[in-house]
């Protein structure tokens, strides 16, 4: 016998052993047998077995236990010589089919045949879910005693016991109730035939419920037959009455649903038996059960009785007739088919009641009474099923469906609804805002949860809905189209301006402390709370950015989803610097976008839909980087240095758009966005190294511009690309002109400084000859409005480039001034002066008023769909043609033209007069007149703030040009006054980000003598003459108003310094704004402007130094320096007097009551300031202005005043100060008396006569110096009983005397006299008793003079010493009334006072 192979033997040895074994011819250790026929049977017994030579190994010592579940080793198919495999059959499949391993058997599961098994229908139930299984205490006790058995096993055992106990009842119920007396069935088996007992006419079928299932095979049938025979014997022994009685008892004990199920089960079997018996009737006997008829009738009568008690439901008109042969239609349940009947007609709305809004699948708002066909899929089984469409509540419910298609459909419809709502399609047809309703309902977080779905379709639809919610259509188009305007790259952050309620309540807290307290609180606030005030912050708090990065990086969505994600990211970046930083710092987000959507090499992409945006340059991705770079210079530097944008910019800009192997529109937009990104980086002085590399490319692009401008019609995308190219060259020219920053001591300014620019002047000096022809070519189209609007941004960018070019040229120390002066002269004579004389330019000036937001404030109404937590510009419907951002707007071109003229006039003084002739255009004059006229200011919204900023640029540049012209030659008086009024109006309107313009207006325009022509045209003299007319001969002469105005004009430089000290913006913001407007690129921190919550200066800015002086005095108990106090107060009063006299429209926004409150602050600042003679004269002149007949009716002290919490509180403080330090000062007393007029609140008079009675002795202002008429205090009669009693008490006690307080003495006497002689029958009993008592006490007064005044008062007359006239004899009515009262007093007596 050969030995087994050993471990050291090789394959050659094994082959040698095999050859020896075959040569020896020894018997093998195994026996080979033929495999039997697997499909054996009688049918195939006569066929010879197939010649299958497959060997089967039969081991002798086969173990008893089955082998372990280990996968069999892989087998190789080896066809036998006699049986070749078919060519189309897989060998592995054939091997798998013959596999006998246990694993193959276990995995091959064949269901058993259930065709002959009876199907038991589920038990009908009135509840939606099965009853919850509750373990009783008995069950728990039993389970504890009997081994460890599961709850399921115990329940099954209990059911078996219950089934075993109830066979007798089960035999009765299914065997009764046939519809007829005789029922045929199948031929009984011998076992069933033996069940008929002798001597009985009853015959029973076999058991239907007790089948023996669960017992052993040999015992199941025998046990079931035994139970059946016992049941038959028991029934035979009972009388029919006993059977019916037992039946009723069992029915009462059983569940009605179980009985109904058993009946239906029996009825089904009987129907089956009838069918079978009819087929076998010729050869089969019939079984008669005529004696069971009473039993059947008892069962059948009960449902009939029940049917009589219950009213019949109306028959449903089904669209089709159900057939019994249909699946599950053997028993028709009409209530479940109720939904298939026709819908009722739509109810017509008879009232104006609000109804729930319903929308179509395209988001359209459906009318309440619209009748649509059902095949549109707009009807459902909810409330108001006859109405088509889905409500928002139903759509929300559908988003929680388990079916992904339904979730996607609901999100799609909601996205369509949002898009249409933002487009303004719903208008006023809906009550309230759809966006606000959705946000309040939690739609934001519904979208966020949908982004975490596992289905790509749901994710795509959720992203689409998120874009529809966040990205307002039209906003990005507006900002892109105005990128090349004057400072068009600067934008306001799109974030809510409202603060938390706690911050609003703590406005007095210092900003540093507020910031320290706010940041940890904001970090701990949950996302829903954040989203209630700011949607973007709430979204960022939910880890939105990592999820969007995952979708882009892992799921590889389609082009639409990619564009939606990029649009959402752009909206997040526009929110604030913080949001842009979070987008930049999200791990792998920007890396994925740059790698996948901004590659340096790609396959050519043809026109038409793109299957995928991956590895293809995308203009939207480039725009995202541009928006991120606009948020701050640090972000721009990180983008350029960390993501290899240099190679990508070079790759895209180096080729013309036609050569980028992309669709034409995408190539144009991609090239435009690349140029804009470079321009933004150049705005910080970065990216200069690219200019040296791409200089030939830029020169070639500039040379092609005239040919592109000559195409008809001009392509809008090409015009935007050309404008972006010129904007880039403008920034590079400014970078070349900027000088290295000097050593700066201020840390705020040092932080803005950077390394010098890498672009030199010699590299940009050759650009002007290429740009100027482009400007000339576009200006020829000015007379053709359609062509002019098509090339709109190009001439604007050309003008801005020329301004930057000459500004940088004049700053070069190595250049000769004569060269650039001669070039400016040439440009002015050849281009600008002919342009200024063109009539078409005058039409542009005339259209300013029609496109102005200031002249049309109603055109900027907040959008209906503008929730405060989600800010947008609201340009969904597009801008009208005649609007500031419309296609026919003259603002961008005229602003750029004024910018160039200002630059030339600043450098070349000799051109100033010629260029300033543009200011005499009638359209500009009319525009200024309408802007200066008093009127309602536009409501400050995100769009109005953006539009007003551009409008203010034009106004400032026009005023700057006028100021330069006025410094060289006098302006016409009317023009100078108009420019000054425009400067004053603009100063109070400038928004954050224009701090430099505010400072320049204060420095050069507002306090310029040339803008006050009244000083040389008789203005002071006219004021003196007006004083003489108003004073009259009876008034005491004082310092003339004309003298004060002349002195103010002389002190104008000091006044300017005072306001520059107190009204200049913060230094850091001023430096940032200055760097932007001066082109100092190395100091520009960001292109994102501050939040436009309110204008930089308040409307009452002329009083601002005085208000700050008052607050400093309140915070400094020791007092302020007399010199500073006197100087500041005097300069403010002088300037306010100038405005009140010559520019009253400048103070139109400040109510007279607010001006009075500011004048009171002069007396509250210091105890000695009001005694100074200049202050006395100025306050007296301003008080006279407030008391003019045309101003006094507008004095309202009861309304809310800006900057003042409560006027009564201020007046109480004023009375305290007057009582302490006035010493009877007449001017002080006049200010105390002015709020005591009868038409003002009684609270002010009660404060004086109730709490400050001692001040009455110091109010010695003569009647002749009272600034208003005495009738203002006496008419109408006083009706406040408490005040009348105070009047009477002060008169009787002597606290109010004519020599101490002549004015209020006359007032008190007048009101008391009117009260005691009043005979109003509608007066209350309390008033009548007080009147009678006061008259009685007056009659008994010991002071004869006071008694005479109170009883004989007639009319007020300030010319008399007493201030009123007296009756020589009382009128008869008063005399009779007094006599009747005094007779009653003499009879009854009166108590002493």
Swiss-Prot record:
It is found in: Nucleus. The keyword Glycosyltransferase does not apply. Residues 64-74 have a biased composition (Pro residues). It holds the Pfam family RPAP1_C. Residues 34-53, 61-94, 266-295, 496-531 are annotated as: Disordered. Residues 518-531 have a biased composition (Basic and acidic residues). The modification Phosphothreonine is found at residue 321. Its main location: nucleus. Part of an RNA polymerase II complex that contains POLR2A, POLR2B, POLR2C, POLR2D, POLR2E, POLR2F, POLR2G, POLR2H, POLR2I, POLR2J, POLR2K, POLR2L, RPAP1, FCP1 plus the general transcription factors TFIIB and TFIIF. This is RNA polymerase II-associated protein 1. It comes from Homo sapiens (Human). The lineage of its organism: Eukaryota, Metazoa, Chordata, Craniata, Vertebrata. The gene is RPAP1.
């Amino acid at each position: 016998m050969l030995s087994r192979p050993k471990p050291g033997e090789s394959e050659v040895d094994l082959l040698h052993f095999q050859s020896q074994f075959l040569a020896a011819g020894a018997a093998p250790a195994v026996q080979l047998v033929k495999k039997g026929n697997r499909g054996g049977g009688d049918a195939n017994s006569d066929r010879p077995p197939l010649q299958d030579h497959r060997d089967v190994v039969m081991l002798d010592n086969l173990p008893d236990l089955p082998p372990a579940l280990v996968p069999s080793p892989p087998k190789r198919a080896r066809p036998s010589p006699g049986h070749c495999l078919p060519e189309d059959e897989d060998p592995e499949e054939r091997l798998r089919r013959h596999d006998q391993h246990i694993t193959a058997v276990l995995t091959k599961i064949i269901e058993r045949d259930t065709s002959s098994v009876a199907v038991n229908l589920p038990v009908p139930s009135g509840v939606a879910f099965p009853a919850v299984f509750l373990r009783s205490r008995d069950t728990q006790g039993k389970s504890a005693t009997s081994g460890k058995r599961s709850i399921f096993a115990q329940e099954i055992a209990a059911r078996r016991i219950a089934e075993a106990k109830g066979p007798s009842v089960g035999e009765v119920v299914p065997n009764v109730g046939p519809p007829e007396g005789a029922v045929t069935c199948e031929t009984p088996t011998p076992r069933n035939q033996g069940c008929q007992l002798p001597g009985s006419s009853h015959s029973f079928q076999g058991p239907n419920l007790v089948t023996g299932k669960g017992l052993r095979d040999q015992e199941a049938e025998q046990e079931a037959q035994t139970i059946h025979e016992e049941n038959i014997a028991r029934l035979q022994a009972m009388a029919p009455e006993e059977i019916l009685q037992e039946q009723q008892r069992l029915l009462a004990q059983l569940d009605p649903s179980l009985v109904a199920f058993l009946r239906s089960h029996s009825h089904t079997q009987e129907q089956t038996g009838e069918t079978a018996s009819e087929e076998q009737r010729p050869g089969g006997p019939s079984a008669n059960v005529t004696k069971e008829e009473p039993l059947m009738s008892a069962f059948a009568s009960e449902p009939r009785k029940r049917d009589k008690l219950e009213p019949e439901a109306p028959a449903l008109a089904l669209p089709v007739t159900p057939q019994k042969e249909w699946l599950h239609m053997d028993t028709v349940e009409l209530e479940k088919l109720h939904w298939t009947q026709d819908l009722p007609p739509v109810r017509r709305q008879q009232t104006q009641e609000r109804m729930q809004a319903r929308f179509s699948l395209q988001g359209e708002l459906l009318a309440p009474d619209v009748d649509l066909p059902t095949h549109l899929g707009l009807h459902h089984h909810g409330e108001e099923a006859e109405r088509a469409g889905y409500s928002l509540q139903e759509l929300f419910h559908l988003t929680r469906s388990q079916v992904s298609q339904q979730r996607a459909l609901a999100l799609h419809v909601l996205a369509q609804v949002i898009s249409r709502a933002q487009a303004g399609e719903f208008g006023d047809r809906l009550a309230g805002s759809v966006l606000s309703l959705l946000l309040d309902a939690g739609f934001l977080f519904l979208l966020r949860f949908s982004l975490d779905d596992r289905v790509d379709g749901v994710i795509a639809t959720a992203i689409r809905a998120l874009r529809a919610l966040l990205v307002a259509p039209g906003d990005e188009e507006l900002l892109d189209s105005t990128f090349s305007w004057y400072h068009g790259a600067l934008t306001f952050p799109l974030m809510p301006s409202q603060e938390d309620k706690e911050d609003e309540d703590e406005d007095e807290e210092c900003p540093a402390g507020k910031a320290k307290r706010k940041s940890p609180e904001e970090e701990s606030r949950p996302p829903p709370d954040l989203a209630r005030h700011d949607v973007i912050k709430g979204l960022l708090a939910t880890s939105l950015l990592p999820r969007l990065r995952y979708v882009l990086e892992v799921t590889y969505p389609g082009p639409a989803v990619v564009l939606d994600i990029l649009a959402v990211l752009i909206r997040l970046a526009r929110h604030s610097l913080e949001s842009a930083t979070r987008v930049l710092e999200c791990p792998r987000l920007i890396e994925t976008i740059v790698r996948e959507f901004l590659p340096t090499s790609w396959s050519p992409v043809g026109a038409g839909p793109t299957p995928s945006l991956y590895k293809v340059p995308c203009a939207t991705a480039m725009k995202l980087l541009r928006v991120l770079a606009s948020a701050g210079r640090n972000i721009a530097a990180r983008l350029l240095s960390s993501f290899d944008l240099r190679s990508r910019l070079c790759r895209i800009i180096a080729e013309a758009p036609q050569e980028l192997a992309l669709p034409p529109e995408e190539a144009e937009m991609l090239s435009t966005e690349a140029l804009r990104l470079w321009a933004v980086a150049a705005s910080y002085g970065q990216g200069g190294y690219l200019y040296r590399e791409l200089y030939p490319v830029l020169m070639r692009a500039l040379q092609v511009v005239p040919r592109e401008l000559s195409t008809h019609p001009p392509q809008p995308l090409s015009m935007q690309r050309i404008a972006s190219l010129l904007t880039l060259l403008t920034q590079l020219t400014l970078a070349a002109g900027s000088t290295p920053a000097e050593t700066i001591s201020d840390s705020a300014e040092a932080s803005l400084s950077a390394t010098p620019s890498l672009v030199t002047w010699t590299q940009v000096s050759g650009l002007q000859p290429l740009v100027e022809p482009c400007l000339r070519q576009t200006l020829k189209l000015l007379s053709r409005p359609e062509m002019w609007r098509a090339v709109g941004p190009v001439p604007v960018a050309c003008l801005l480039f020329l301004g930057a070019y000459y500004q940088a040229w004049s700053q070069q120390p190595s250049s000769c001034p004569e060269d650039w002066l001669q070039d400016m002269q040439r440009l002015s004579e050849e281009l600008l002066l002919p342009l200024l004389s063109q009539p078409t330019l005058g039409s542009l000036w005339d259209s300013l008023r029609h496109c102005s937001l200031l002249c049309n404030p109603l055109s900027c109404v907040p959008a209906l769909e503008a929730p405060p937590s989600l800010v947008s510009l609201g340009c969904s419907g597009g801008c009208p043609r005649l609007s500031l951002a419309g296609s026919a707007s003259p603002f961008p071109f005229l602003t750029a033209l004024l910018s160039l003229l200002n630059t030339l006039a600043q450098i070349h003084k000799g051109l100033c007069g010629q260029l300033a002739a543009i200011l005499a255009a009638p359209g500009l004059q009319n525009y200024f007149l309408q802007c200066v006229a008093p009127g309602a200011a536009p409501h400050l919204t995100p769009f109005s703030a953006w539009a007003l900023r551009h409008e203010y640029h034009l106004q400032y540049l026009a005023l700057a040009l006028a100021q330069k012209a006025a410094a060289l030659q006098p302006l016409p008086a009317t023009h100078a006054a108009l420019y000054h009024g425009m400067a004053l109006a603009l100063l109070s309107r400038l928004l954050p980000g224009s701090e430099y313009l505010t400072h320049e207006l204060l420095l050069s325009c507002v306090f310029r003598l040339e803008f006050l022509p009244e000083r040389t045209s008789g203005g002071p003299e006219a004021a003196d003459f007006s004083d003489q007319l108003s004073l009259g001969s009876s008034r005491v002469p004082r310092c003339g108003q004309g003298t004060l105005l002349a002195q103010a004009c002389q002190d104008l430089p000091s006044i300017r310094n005072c306001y520059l000290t107190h009204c200049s913006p913060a230094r850091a913001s001023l430096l940032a704004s200055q760097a932007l407007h001066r082109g100092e690129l190395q100091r520009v921190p960001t292109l994102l402007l501050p939040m436009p919550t309110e204008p930089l200066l308040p409307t009452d800015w002329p009083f601002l130094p005085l208000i700050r002086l008052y607050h400093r005095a309140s915070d400094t108990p020791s007092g302020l320096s007399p010199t500073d106090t006197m100087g500041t107060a005097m300069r403010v009063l002088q300037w306010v007097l100038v405005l009140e006299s010559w520019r009253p429209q400048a103070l139109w926004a400040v109510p007279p009551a607010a001006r009075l409150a500011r004048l009171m602050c002069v007396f509250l600042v210091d105890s000695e300031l009001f005694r100074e003679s200049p202050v006395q004269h100025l306050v007296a002149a301003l008080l006279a202005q407030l008391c003019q007949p045309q101003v006094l009716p507008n004095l309202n002290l009861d309304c809310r005043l800006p900057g003042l919490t409560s006027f009564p509180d201020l007046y109480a403080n004023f009375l305290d100060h007057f009582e302490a330090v006035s010493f009877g000062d007449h001017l002080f007393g006049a200010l105390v008396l002015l709020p005591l007029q009868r038409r003002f609140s009684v609270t002010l008079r009660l404060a004086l006569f109730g709490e400050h009675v001692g001040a009455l002795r110091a109010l010695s202002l003569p009647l002749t110096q009272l600034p208003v008429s005495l009738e203002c205090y006496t008419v109408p009669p006083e009706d406040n009983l408490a005040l009348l009693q105070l009047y009477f008490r002060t008169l009787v006690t002597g606290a109010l005397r004519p020599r101490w307080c002549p004015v209020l003495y006359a007032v008190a006497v007048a009101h008391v006299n009117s009260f005691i002689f009043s005979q109003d029958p509608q007066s209350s009993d309390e008033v009548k008793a007080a009147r009678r008592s006061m008259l009685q006490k007056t009659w008994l007064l010991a002071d004869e003079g006071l008694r005479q005044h109170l009883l004989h008062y007639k009319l007020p007359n300030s010319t008399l010493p007493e201030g009123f006239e007296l009756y020589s004899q009382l009128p008869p009515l008063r005399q009779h009334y007094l006599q009747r009262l005094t007779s009653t007093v003499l009879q009854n007596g009166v108590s002493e006072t």
